[in-house]
Amino acid sequence: MKCLLLALGLSLMCGNQATDIPQTMQDLDLQEVAGRWHSVAMVASDISLLDSESVPLRVYVEELRPTPEGNLEIILREGANHACVERNIVAQKTEDPAVFTVNYQGERKISVLDTDYAHYMFFCVGPPLPSAEHGMVCQYLARTQKVDEEVMEKFSRALQPLPGRVQIVQDPSGGQERCGF
């Protein structure tokens, strides 16, 4: 009986630590998401994932390119040694058309939550797999640098399930040396 209670208590504790990715899209047309994008807003389940320009998950997506194999090449900029560095990452397709895996700071899952293809896309990057640790970063991408308040509201609603989220809204008119702008 003591072992059963201990197992139940541990499973409840671990369940509270997990961070679930909000619902993903049913279908995703890779050809439609291809092209230039701008990181407009970032949200994290833990502030330490975004609290400086050089943290590994604070990246600025610039372009998405579908590959002939059905994968997705992601061109991004990130802070490194007080400079912006461009990187290309290939996200591998999975059975779910809106979910990819990527080897970036460990193997991670990228889930596309929503897109209208012409104006916005929301996605989340989960913690390294397999992992019980929490730590998810989500982004609102837009085809232009202009923040659409309606879409920002929709982004916020899509992320309601994330515990302790922190939102950072980028200033597109801000400094030129900031990565992505």
From Swiss-Prot:
Domain of life (superkingdom): Eukaryota
Molecular function GO terms recorded: retinol binding
Main localization of the protein described in the UniProt heading: secreted
GO CC field: extracellular region
Bridged cysteine pairs (disulfide): 84-179, 124-138
Keyword terms: Disulfide bond, Milk protein, Retinol-binding, Secreted, Signal, Transport
Claim: Signal is one of the keywords in the record: yes
Statement: the UniProt record of this protein carries the keyword Kinase: no
Alphabetical list of InterPro entries matching this protein: Blactoglobulin (IPR002447), Calycin (IPR012674), Lipocalin (IPR002345), Lipocalin_CS (IPR022272), Lipocln_cytosolic_FA-bd_dom (IPR000566)
Entry function: Lactoglobulin is the primary component of whey, it binds retinol and is probably involved in the transport of that molecule.
Protein name: Beta-lactoglobulin-2
Source organism of this protein record: Equus caballus (Horse)
